[in-house]
Amino acid sequence: MKVRPSVKKLCPKCKIIRRHGVVRVICDNPRHKQRQG
C-alpha cells in the first residue's frame, strides 16, 4: 500500500474508488494498491 498525496492509475487494470471519503486504487497487482493520505 502506497500512501500518496495524489493517486493515479499505474496500469489499465487499476480502478479508482472512494471508501468512506478515502480515495483508493485497487488492482490485480498488489504493488499498485494506493491510498490518498
From Swiss-Prot:
Gene Ontology annotations for the cellular component aspect, listed alphabetically: cytoplasm; ribonucleoprotein complex; ribosome
What is the protein's name according to its record?
A: Large ribosomal subunit protein bL36
Family that this chain belongs to: Belongs to the bacterial ribosomal protein bL36 family.
Q: Which GO molecular function, any one, fits this protein according to its record?
A: structural constituent of ribosome
Please list the disulfide bridges: none
Keyword tags: Ribonucleoprotein, Ribosomal protein
Q: For this entry, list what GO says about its biological process.
A: translation
Which chain positions lie within coiled-coil regions? Answer: none
Short name of any one Pfam family annotated for the protein = Ribosomal_L36
For this protein, the record's SUPFAM superfamilies field holds: Ribosomal protein L36 (SSF57840)
